[in-house]
Regions:
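N-terminal signal peptide c-region/cleavage motif recognized by signal peptidases
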Residues: 21-25
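Structural preference for beta-rich elements and adjacent junctions enriched in aromatics
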Residues: 26-191
Length: 191
């Protein structure tokens, strides 16, 4: 299994609503047009890792991602789809990670903030200022373990001491896994 399978992490989704954007570990070869989220007006989502609620089918699909490792900027060889919805309280991500060898997914249950690069995980880096200097991040391992913290681009450092009240659930599938992740808006830190 290549590093990419284990590191579906630093890719740009483009500017998101309210000026928030995902920080990138790799530069995009071409500009990505602004992307949008679906406004959720129904009852709060019950996180179960399944993307079977009707609103997920209505949310825009973001699927243009690039490698960070082993070759920064190369188009990702395996498909990952991200959908974003927002309600009054949170950003809610629905992620579908396809894998041609799902039996090789490294889904290790670990303590909080112990999701490391030797495991399969999805990571989201949010850069509320849009300056690409600092970001808040969350990693969700394929077994459902969480790690969160802050990232500094200046020294390429990840600090796992902050906790952002993020909730997530994972569902293993025949061809990969899916993740539902709820990130409270109140936890986004603006400089």
């Amino acid at each position: 299994m290549s590093l990419l399978a284990r590191h579906r992490m630093r890719a740009v989704l483009g500017p998101l609503l309210l000026g928030a954007s995902l920080a990138a570990g790799a530069q995009e070869p071409a500009a990505v047009p602004p992307q949008r989220a679906l406004r959720l007006t129904q009852a709060p989502l019950q996180l179960d890792g399944r993307l079977d609620e009707a609103f997920w089918a209505q949310a825009p699909v973001h699927a243009q991602f690039y490698e960070f490792e082993p070759q920064a900027g190369r188009a990702a060889p395996w498909r990952t789809e991200v959908r974003l919805v927002v309600d009054d309280q949170a950003l809610i991500f629905g992620i579908r990670a396809f894998d041609p060898a799902p039996q090789q997914i490294r889904a290790t249950r670990v303590r909080r903030d112990q999701v490391k690069r030797d495991q399969d995980f999805i990571a989201i880096f949010l850069d509320p200022s849009g300056r690409q200097r600092h970001a808040q991040f969350v990693r969700v391992g394929a077994a459902g373990s969480l790690a969160d913290g802050s990232y500094s681009a200046q020294d390429d450092n990840e600090d796992f001491s902050p906790d952002f009240g993020v909730q997530a659930a994972v569902q293993r599938l025949a061809d990969g896994y899916s993740v539902e992740l709820r990130w409270p808006l109140a936890q986004l830190r603006y400089p």
